A protein has these predicted regions:
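A short, conserved structural fragment
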Residues: 44-53
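Phosphate-centric recognition/catalysis
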Residues: 69-96
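Minor-groove-contacting beta-hairpin "wing" of winged helix-turn-helix DNA-binding domains
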Residues: 53-64
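Canonical helix-turn-helix DNA-binding module
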Residues: 30-42
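Short amphipathic alpha-helical elements of helix-turn-helix/winged-helix folds
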Residues: 10-17, 70
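Alpha-helix C-caps/helix-loop-beta hinges
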Residues: 17, 43-44
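Short acidic, hydrophobic short linear motifs in intrinsically disordered regions
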Residues: 17-28
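Short alpha-helical segments that sit at the start of domains
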Residues: 1-8, 42
Length: 96
């Protein structure tokens, strides 16, 4: 099944910044990520990779072999350069 935009955004953050915590994902995206991470784990695209050695020992997430297979990659080195995904303004200001 296709992934929604929030799931794709969360998956991209995990793919490029792994291992990463939910809090770190939320910092990058600016919105809650618990639901998205849970959905990606259920789809076997993301899995727990351990725990961060900080207070609270939050779970670290990373991509799976299923992620690589589904997106036609042999490894994370096959990811396109992250700078291809620069933010695009929601609207272009009109010229005076």
């Amino acid at each position: 099944s296709r992934l929604s935009k929030p799931l794709m955004e969360t998956l991209a953050v995990i793919a490029y910044r792994q291992p990463v915590t939910v809090n770190e994902i939320e910092t990058v995206r600016g919105v809650g990520a618990d639901h998205s991470v849970r959905a990606l784990v259920e789809r076997r695209l993301v899995e727990e990779k351990g725990r961060k050695q900080t207070p609270g020992r939050p779970v670290l997430y990373g991509t799976t072999d299923e992620f690589l297979h589904r997106f036609g990659m042999n490894g994370l080195a096959d990811l396109p350069p992250e700078n291809l995904f620069s933010p695009v303004p929601a609207r272009v200001p009109s010229e005076p």
